[in-house]
């Protein structure tokens, strides 16, 4: 393995990312609907015929079928290969960033910490996709992402060069526990649910990967991103609500859907955590130094 060049492993990580992206398509569709991820097997949604495994190959399957199902020739959304390609690129980016970027793709990947960082970035980048998609639309974060993230963080800490297993365990407990306590207090003060338990488990996973400091930095950056997005979003929602009150007519079904997906005009917090985490994992120390230098001169 020591003699295999970086470009080869980038292709491997692209393929792994595309496979994960294909599985995420299943998660995004099935979990919010309460459908098992295993049964029934992949099948055509129209005629219910089982899809052979060779047609399920990420990206290749869609190209092979020319964007139409083999059984009843119905169009297959291009979103599927686009999502798989994006996840493939994110998978390759995970290893590329862990190896220090650079232009020499012929160098071998030797250091154990490089593989540990690549595994961490792989989960951070690939996990962001279903968190953003599912949490925004359905206001839930799959346990297959948050809980697996905690386990992955604890296992990665066993590789020398990163945080220690104790730091990883403390990061998971203190980050998750701290956010749970913060949400509990906010719920009591505001007299309504202020924090979902999915966010708690997600931050616990980030704590397991980055330690307490990294998780706290991620939480702060996510909160700032949330403010930057929610302020203009809230203004737009209020303006739209005023327009409706002045005579705009919407169907009851549309109103019910709006209420379900955008309750109280709010966007779930999970996507902001998922975006902030890989940024802080890569550049947290540098960004913190810039902030300190800017504030304190």
Give the location of each predicted region.
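Hydrophobic alpha-helical transmembrane segments
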Residues: 1-18, 154-161, 274-297
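Membrane-proximal soluble regions of multi-pass membrane proteins
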Residues: 24-79, 246-261, 269
């Amino acid at each position: 393995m020591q003699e295999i060049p970086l470009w080869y492993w980038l292709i491997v990580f692209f393929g792994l990312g595309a496979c994960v992206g294909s599985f995420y398509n299943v998660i995004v569709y099935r979990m919010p609907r309460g459908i098992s991820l295993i049964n029934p097997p992949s099948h055509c949604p129209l005629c219910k015929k089982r899809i052979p495994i060779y047609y399920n190959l990420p990206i290749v399957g869609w190209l092979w079928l020319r964007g139409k199902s083999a059984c009843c020739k119905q169009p297959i959304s291009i979103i599927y290969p686009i999502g798989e390609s994006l996840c493939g690129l994110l998978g390759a980016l995970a290893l590329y960033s862990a190896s220090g970027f650079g232009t020499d793709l012929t160098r071998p990947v030797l250091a154990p910490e490089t593989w540990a960082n690549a595994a961490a970035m792989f989960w951070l980048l690939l996990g962001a996709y279903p968190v953003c998609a599912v949490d925004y639309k359905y206001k839930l974060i799959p346990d297959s992402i948050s809980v697996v993230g905690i386990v992955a963080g604890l296992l990665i800490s066993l590789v020398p060069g990163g945080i220690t297993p104790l730091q990883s365990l403390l990061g998971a407990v203190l980050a998750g526990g701290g956010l749970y306590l913060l949400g509990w207090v906010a719920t009591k003060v505001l007299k309504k649910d202020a924090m979902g338990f999915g966010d708690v488990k997600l931050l616990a996973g980030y704590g397991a990967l980055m330690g307490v400091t990294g998780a706290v930095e991620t939480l702060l950056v996510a909160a700032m991103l949330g403010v930057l997005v929610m302020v203009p979003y809230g203004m737009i929602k209020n303006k739209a609500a005023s327009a409706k009150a002045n005579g705009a007519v919407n169907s009851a079904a549309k109103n019910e859907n709006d209420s379900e997906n955008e309750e109280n005009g709010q966007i779930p917090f999970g996507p902001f955590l998922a975006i902030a985490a890989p940024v802080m994992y890569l550049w947290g120390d540098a960004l913190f130094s810039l902030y300190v230098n800017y504030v304190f001169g």
